[in-house]
Amino acid sequence: NEEILTKALVAEFANAFDIPAAEVRMAAHAGWEELLQSRRDMEAKGEEVLDWLKQTGRRGIVLAGRPYHVDPEIHHGIPELITSYGFAVLTEDSVSHLGKVERPLVVTDQWMYHSRLYAAASFVKTQENLDLIQLNSFGCGLDAVTTDQVSDILTRSGKIYTVLKIDEVNNLGAARIRIRSLIAALRVRDQRNFERKVVSSAYHRAVFTKEMKKDYTLLCPQMSPIHFDLIEPAIRSFGYKIEVLQNHNRSAVDVGLQYVNNDACYPSL
């Protein structure tokens, strides 16, 4: 938000460096305009590459990562590895403006990066000459949310979803195998004239109505034994049927391993 940023900069520079407020506002506006222009340049370059792909009949990979993945010390040359196989590489922010996310999503979409990522995936699923590879580093718990959602957007429409888990170790062996496997799968699909059907990724929630209050039981996940043992009788006092699910047994662990992303940490849930 340019207004909030400008106010913060005026307060900081006026107090610490005695710089006139008008000068700070002018500089902040110029910087903000440059930021917006850089984004427009990125989008224009993305459209340019997409046009080139159509003209040449080539394929492209949207390499989706967090902002720190532009650092060569973190991505370990994966973009160059992909281009060595004859694919063009695009970032998610170069194509996200072309995609429209069908809502609501399964996840809570409240972060700008996540929204951009879902928009990029929504665009990729409509393009036959594009696929997406998502980078994941440091076991980020929030990426456990994004990887599941991006996978859902792509696979529902018949796209192959690939995530590369990379860390500080400079070893491209596993990444190379995953990328070559993706390329091989795409070639097999082309040979077999595989046809996809693009479908909506919107999630249709069942709404709990007043009529359900009498006959339906609310199932509550056990997130904290101390607190949730108090929540159950509190909600029942309002006339709801509720059962807090117990998770201190082997079957609960097995179900969790089957349906929950192994990288999901408590804050991400």
Feature annotation, model-predicted:
Residues 1-269:
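An N-terminal assembly and electron-transfer interface module characteristic of large anaerobic redox
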